């Protein structure tokens, strides 16, 4: 008997921070066919990188079943971290190549766990360059920031 086909979900994420650290917010758009869901949240105090990570984590944790995911972020920190750096961090006990503890390790570990049920393809786009979904994710992140001032 064949495995049921996994749904294909498209996700766009963004984070925002007023001051770094300062109040911050994150936003995410999840799209499955014609169904679209928007998520947002925030923290105070926080950093922009933490909000970028939390946007991706929150979107992936919102998925109710295993999916094939195309996740688009404007954060090189998130994309490089999850597609390149994380493998050595894990091998080195969550330490960088110069033996320092990985920054935001709590969120990197949470993102690593959130990925497990899914097949995720990571995409990067330039922020604030007129990409409609990225602009909307940015608006959601700013709303999340405003709610956490």
UniProtKB/Swiss-Prot annotation:
Cofactor note text: Binds 1 Mg(2+) ion per subunit. May bind a second metal ion at a regulatory site, or after substrate binding.
Subcellular location as annotated: Cytoplasm
Reaction(s) this enzyme catalyzes, per UniProt: Endonucleolytic cleavage to 5'-phosphomonoester
Keywords (A to Z) from UniProt: Cytoplasm, Endonuclease, Hydrolase, Magnesium, Metal-binding, Nuclease
Cofactor: Mg(2+)
Coiled coil: none
Example GO biological process: DNA replication, removal of RNA primer
GO terms, molecular function: magnesium ion binding; nucleic acid binding; RNA-DNA hybrid ribonuclease activity
Residues that bind Mg(2+) 1: 14, 52, 74
Residue numbers binding Mg(2+) 2: 14, 138
EC number: 3.1.26.4
RNase H type-1 domain mapped to chain residues: 5-146
Keyword Ribosomal protein recorded: no
One cellular component (GO) term of this entry: cytoplasm
Assembly, per entry: Monomer.
Family that this chain belongs to: Belongs to the RNase H family.
Protein name as it appears in the record: Ribonuclease H
The species this protein was found in: Afipia carboxidovorans (strain ATCC 49405 / DSM 1227 / KCTC 32145 / OM5) (Oligotropha carboxidovorans)
